[in-house]
Amino acid sequence: MKNEFLNFEQIDRATWQQLHRKTTIPLSQSELNSIKSFNDRIQLHEVSDIYLPLVNLIHIYRKARKDLNFTKSLFLQKTIKPQPFIIGVSGSVAVGKSTTSRLLQILIARTFKYAKVELVTTDGFLQPYAVLEERQLLNKKGFPESYDMEKLIDFLDKIKNGYDCQIPVYSHEIYDIIPNKTQEIKSPDFLIVEGINVFQNPQNQRLYVSDYFDLSIYVDADVEHIETWYLERFQKLLTLAKNDPNNYYHRFTQMTYPEILSIAQNTWKNINLANLEKFIEPTRNRADIILHKAENHEIDKIYLKK
């Protein structure tokens, strides 16, 4: 693991929080609670200590991108039209990517006045349940072959070139793409793309999703902690599904606790852990920034690519 981080500056929490002058946190604890994943934990001091310095760094990266585009336009002797600043957020299932992404969306929108900040998840680019079932890929859901990567790359290419797009929407409740529902993305100043697969090797070996990113962030944690968080999340999903027969997880609520635990542990080991070890974690060093979370969900180390 040490060799993997040779090209990164390791910064501890105490040092990182000093890299941004103390300002008023631009959201309340109730707002924070409303955007966090239901099995995640985050307090306002995490916003102040970790995320405000991170937004400051995003400002630096964005300015560098704009300066480069301006210089390129002088070199090419033509105008380069404005492009959205695209941020990729990756990491394991249950590690807290969604909380990080939603929080960044709010903080960026409130830091860059008048900026339009959109967030999409790659869940919307999963193949529909029926397609996965037909191809016998239900046990590979979340693996590279379960996504329509061409559609994802086509979306990013269109957005980068100034086109409006409509993309599918995924529901964890029905465990499938929602029929006849789309998310419209129109001329964002910032676009956050969150998903377990955003740094992975392309199927055609020529074009990476991450080729479109101006900044990439990997949310990391020790495997044993992620497993605990996953099992907690599975149990909470069942609690939410208890009175909803249409919820995918409702079928598990009729089982005994040992049966439920066995299913959750097997799903973690055979699907999520296997996917993490083979496809997700090996892409970690492609990130510009790695946020490492401790057992209490707080970020204790930050790795910044040199």
From Swiss-Prot:
One Pfam family per UniProt: PRK
Compartments in which it is found: Cytoplasm
Biological processes annotated in GO: coenzyme A biosynthetic process
Keywords: ATP-binding, Coenzyme A biosynthesis, Cytoplasm, Kinase, Nucleotide-binding, Transferase
Organism superkingdom: Bacteria
Pathway(s) the chain acts in: Cofactor biosynthesis; coenzyme A biosynthesis; CoA from (R)-pantothenate: step 1/5
GO CC annotations, alphabetized: cytoplasm
Catalytically driven reaction(s): (R)-pantothenate + ATP = (R)-4'-phosphopantothenate + ADP + H(+)
Main location class: cytoplasm
Record-listed ATP binding positions: G91, S92, V93, A94, V95, G96, K97, S98
Keyword Cytoplasm: yes
GO molecular function terms noted in the UniProt entry: ATP binding; pantothenate kinase activity
Residue runs in coiled coils: none
Entry EC no(s): 2.7.1.33
NCBIfam families: panK_bact
Assigned protein family: Belongs to the prokaryotic pantothenate kinase family.
Identification of the protein by name: Pantothenate kinase
